[in-house]
Structures are given as C-alpha cells and as structure tokens.
Swiss-Prot record:
Keywords: Ribonucleoprotein, Ribosomal protein. Belongs to the bacterial ribosomal protein bL27 family. This is Large ribosomal subunit protein bL27. Residues 1-24 are annotated as: Disordered. The lineage of its organism: Bacteria, Pseudomonadati, Pseudomonadota, Alphaproteobacteria, Hyphomicrobiales. It comes from Agrobacterium fabrum (strain C58 / ATCC 33970).
Length: 89
C-alpha cells in the first residue's frame, strides 16, 4: 500500500491592497476646484494657499490655477495653487 505523507500548509500568501498614495497633480499642472493634488498618510506635504486638506490628509484645490510646491527653510514642503489670471473684460 503506497502512501504519501500529508504536505504542510503555508502560512504566507497574504498582502494588503495598495492605497494609491502620492502626487496626482505635479508642479505647474492646471487644476480646477475639487481636484485632488495628492494623497498621503499624515502631513508629509502641508497645505498652502488656495488648497484644502481632507480628514485623511488629502490635499485638494480650492481655486482654479496651477499647482506649486515650495520647500521652506525648516524643510516642510507646502503645496499651493497659484490662481489663474482672470481675463479683463
């Protein structure tokens, strides 16, 4: 009677789903109000002028314009939106 001993089961084989964090709109890119500029965990980037910050630290545009990243002397990177120049009518 030929028998085969039972094979062991692996305890590996799991991984969490990626959260798609990071910059969505880069420096100089045009945005409209509500556009997500970047997703992050914690404040790796800080909100500057014309941007809002969500409860999950997502930074989003409050006005139409171009995205701007600026590093201050203390090393903090601030994200802001430079408003588009309105056409004089």
């Amino acid at each position: 009677m030929a028998h085969k001993k039972a094979g062991g089961s692996s305890r590996n084989g799991r991984d969490s789903e990626s959260k798609r964090l990071g910059v969505k709109k880069f420096g100089g890119e045009a945005v409209i109000p509500g556009n997500i500029i970047l997703r992050q965990r914690g404040t790796q980037w800080h909100p500057g002028a014309n941007v809002g910050i969500g409860k999950d630290h997502t930074i989003f545009a409050l006005t139409a314009g171009n995205v701007n990243f600026r590093t201050k002397a203390n090393g903090r990177v601030f994200v802001s939106v430079a408003p588009k120049a309105e056409a004089a009518e």
